[in-house]
């Protein structure tokens, strides 16, 4: 009997030690994640802040600057302030999705209406970029979800395609549905992305083309928000290069939250 008691105590002790090691590793991983995120945020903030400061310093140091030059520097500062505002907003969204998911309430929503609203809001940029967007989302496609996050899913993916594909032809489709889930595809006619990048494009601050991404005004958080928003709706998302060319996002959304 004493032998079994000793064995039992030993097993409990081993389990306790293993759990403590596991928790330590988890806490270390979280701390490393927070540190990396802080470093990335600091790095991303430097560019717009430096640009704004540089433009304003130039104006202050040259009070006799002609009006046209002054206007150009003011416009540059204004554009960078917009980028800074977008970055702060995206960081806030990511933080809420990480720690305050109850912040986002769910309602019965029509996905057709949401997609139409996204297309309307992107219409000017779509025209300026020479892009075309078509969709086959049926009317009255109801889902229990959060409007802001569902809007972000479609907006951020389309925004990426418009930014990085010349004269993009983008297609949005409801590819399948069952009693529990809706399945979507958003594809473009661009060159796709390197295969090794496919596994990373939903990571925070990951950029396939760093120079072009910053030039386009991206925050590096758009697709990470997409992934978090899909997970919030009990779905999954992947990106694949199409055989015929272009990038395709395939994702699912639960009709009703669990």
Predicted features, each with a name:
Residues 168, 234-235:
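Conserved glycine-rich
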Residues 99-104, 142-145:
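Conserved micro-motifs of the catalytic ATP-binding
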Residues 193-207:
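Short conserved segment of the HATPase_c
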């Amino acid at each position: 009997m004493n032998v079994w008691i000793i064995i039992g105590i030993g097993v409990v002790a081993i389990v306790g030690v293993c759990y403590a090691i596991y928790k330590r590793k988890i806490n270390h991983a979280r701390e490393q994640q927070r540190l990396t995120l802080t470093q990335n945020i600091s790095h991303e903030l430097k560019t717009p802040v430096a640009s704004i400061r540089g433009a304003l310093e130039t104006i202050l140091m040259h009070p006799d600057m002609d009006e046209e030059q002054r206007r150009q520097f003011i416009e540059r500062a204004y554009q960078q302030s917009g980028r800074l505002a977008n970055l702060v907003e995206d960081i806030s969204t990511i933080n809420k999705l990480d720690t305050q998911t109850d912040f986002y309430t769910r309602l019965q929503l029509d996905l057709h209406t949401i997609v139409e609203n996204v297309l309307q809001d992107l219409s000017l940029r779509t025209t300026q970029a020479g892009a075309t967007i078509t969709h086959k989302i049926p009317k009255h496609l109801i889902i229990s979800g959060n409007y802001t996050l569902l809007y972000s899913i479609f907006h951020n993916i389309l925004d990426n395609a418009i930014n990085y594909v010349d004269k993009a032809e983008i297609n949005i489709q409801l590819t399948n549905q069952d009693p529990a889930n809706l399945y979507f595809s958003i594809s473009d006619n661009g060159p796709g992305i390197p295969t090794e990048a496919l596994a990373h494009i939903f990571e925070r601050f990951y950029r396939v083309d760093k120079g072009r991404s910053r030039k386009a005004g991206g925050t590096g958080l758009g697709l990470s928000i997409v992934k978090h928003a899909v997970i919030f709706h009990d779905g999954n998302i992947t990106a694949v290069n199409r055989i015929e060319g272009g990038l395709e996002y395939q994702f699912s959304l639960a009709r009703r939250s669990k």
